Amino acid sequence: MSTQPSHRLYILDTDLSTNVSTRHGRIISCRPDGSDLRTVVDGIKNLPDGIVVDHDRGLMYWTSMGTSLSAEGGSIERAKLDGSDHKTIIASGTVGVFTPKQITLARRSGKLYWCDREGMKVMRANTDGSGVEVLWSTGNAAEEDDRRDQMRWCVGVGVDEERGFVYWTQKGPSKGGKGRVFRGPLSQSPFSPDDVEVLIDGLPEPIDLEVDEQSGTLYWTDRGDPPTGNSLNCVSIADVEGVMNGTARGQVRTLARRLHETIGLALDKSGGVCYVTDLAGGVYAVDIKSGQKTVIFSELGDTTGIALV
């Protein structure tokens, strides 16, 4: 297991365990071994959840779910990697940011993709916040019954520009064993229901995901119950295309277990490492080949999203 010494991790701490009136969420940066830990953005009160870094432009984008998960109050924020020039690019009240979750960047097209959990949507926009598109919707955010139906909740998102697909998770009920991984064609907006595929179902509770386009591998975290939940997992996309869902589930490889409400992940493809966070404050490095798990931090905060630059 190796990584480049110049790499840095960017980690979100929601400060979820603190009362909202005194909450100080933050974005933390460190080297992959945990050294040189610093806070780059502080005082975030609205529950930051997903983060992605634009390497070429030196910018980071993150989602904030808002101060209350029962009200529409999310947003998408942007700043330079040192925390300066912080601005909101998609404001609260915009369709698709009810409670936005994981966010990713399609590097060829320069488009942002994210999932909106209680908004029940898969979304896309330009990096300046313009051109907001609803790619997939599973319910009406104005209807409380829809928002409470966790089978409708879209959470994790990944983009494979090589093969032309968007992948996302719908986590299902907490610890319910009804989580699913979907995909739809990048070329469509919105997706035609006939072209949306369920690749894997019956998962404990899948959360964030990432695609290794070169190897055609899908990675995701799962915060469901053991033995297959609270884990980091992967599957070859070719092995689950066009097969029955139960068979697809049997192709999944679990890389790491015994995580504690695991959320975020960030791939270092050249180093063969996947960095993972959990809500108990754990930050881990997992060797993709051996599955060896190294604890970088055991209690960093209430950690969610993570990105590598």
UniProtKB/Swiss-Prot annotation:
InterPro entries: 6-blade_b-propeller_TolB-like, Cueball_EGF_LRP_Nidogen, LDLR_classB_rpt. SMART domains: LY. The keyword Repeat does not apply. Disruption phenotype: Leads to excessive accumulation of lipid droplets and restricted infectious growth in rice. Impairs the cytosol-to-nucleus accumulation of MSN2 upon oleate treatment. Its main location: endoplasmic reticulum. Keywords: Endoplasmic reticulum, Endosome, Golgi apparatus, Lipoprotein, Receptor. SUPFAM superfamilies: Calcium-dependent phosphotriesterase. PANTHER family: VITELLOGENIN RECEPTOR-LIKE PROTEIN-RELATED-RELATED (PTHR46513). Belongs to the LDLR family. This is Low-density lipoprotein receptor-related protein 1. The lineage of its organism: Eukaryota, Fungi, Dikarya, Ascomycota, Pezizomycotina. The gene is LRP1.
